[in-house]
């Protein structure tokens, strides 16, 4: 097994802003999103020395027996609340760019920067699920699928101009600024995340973003995402910018490999077929963006019970060793984790998995147990 002795890994948590987290299963924990739950999760992440938390935005769910993602909080207001009760951990909100003008998002980000004393960053999404926006009369038509990164490029230019200079006069196809002002500006450099996996998404990330988020792939195959990172490296070569990749994984751990595998099989056995079918229909709606989009992977029937993110299943020692392999892929800066049970999962991660990870020695500062 590859050992990550010389690689340091940053770790974040994809907090459950929507009901039931990331498992479309009747056999998984069923819960509603709340500020209190996400506060507990974020404080645990901070306590265990994790680096950041990110919340998504979801404006309409998938239905089914579990009402998957039918119940969601709003990302910016949630992160503003979390900014006020944390002291060290970095916080990222997600901007639904079809709903919010860039000048408003720039000001909201600057406000949370003030609340957090410089610990805030922004995830930009173009919008891929038509019903989220059509319900509000904001869907621009299906031709948008083919032009969404042109739209997002102008959006990001407005953000950068306002944050860096306090003023934008951008005259584009989608946005026309006229002496648009922002003050106060953020006290810290505002980092941008993008999770686009299409060729256009990669080109956008290499030009405007600081981090690229991509899906891990498979079960206990921690480096199978490497071709995705290689595509970003090719895009970066054209822009010369420093952009690192962060990889999304679900952790399902227990005291033994067998116990963890039993949980995973139980979740799969309770898969919410109706919600999964809805996800597939939404993925098929985009005929413009090519085969490499996130939604294509999410809707793949192979492991749709957790939207086909990379899954690490095993004992705490097994998961630690698998995570150490992730960061050996060149261009990888860290991981974004979700858990089947967030509160217990985070405590187990902090006390039983992280201390075994060579890639987290800079956090634990402990002599690590030998991982077979």
Curated annotation (Swiss-Prot):
Reactions that this protein is recorded to catalyse: uracil + FMNH2 + NADH + O2 = (Z)-3-ureidoacrylate + FMN + NAD(+) + H2O + H(+); thymine + FMNH2 + NADH + O2 = (Z)-2-methylureidoacrylate + FMN + NAD(+) + H2O + H(+)
Gene Ontology terms: biological process: alkanesulfonate catabolic process; nitrogen utilization; uracil catabolic process
EC class: oxidoreductase
EC number(s) per entry: 1.14.99.46
Domain of life, per lineage: Bacteria
Residue sites binding FMN per the record: 57-58, 123, 132, 148-149, 198
Assigned keywords, A-Z: Flavoprotein, FMN, Monooxygenase, NADP, Oxidoreductase
GO MF annotations, alphabetized: alkanesulfonate monooxygenase activity; uracil oxygenase activity
UniProt cross-references to InterPro entries, sorted A to Z: Luciferase-like_dom, Luciferase-like_sf, Pyrimidine_monooxygenase_RutA, SsuD_RutA_monooxygenase
Pfam entry (one): Bac_luciferase
Cross-referenced Gene3D superfamilies: Luciferase-like domain
Functional note: The FMN-N(5)-oxide reacts spontaneously with NADH to produce FMN. Requires the flavin reductase RutF to regenerate FMN in vivo.
Family: Belongs to the NtaA/SnaA/DszA monooxygenase family. RutA subfamily.
Protein name: Pyrimidine monooxygenase RutA
Organism: Methylorubrum extorquens (strain PA1)
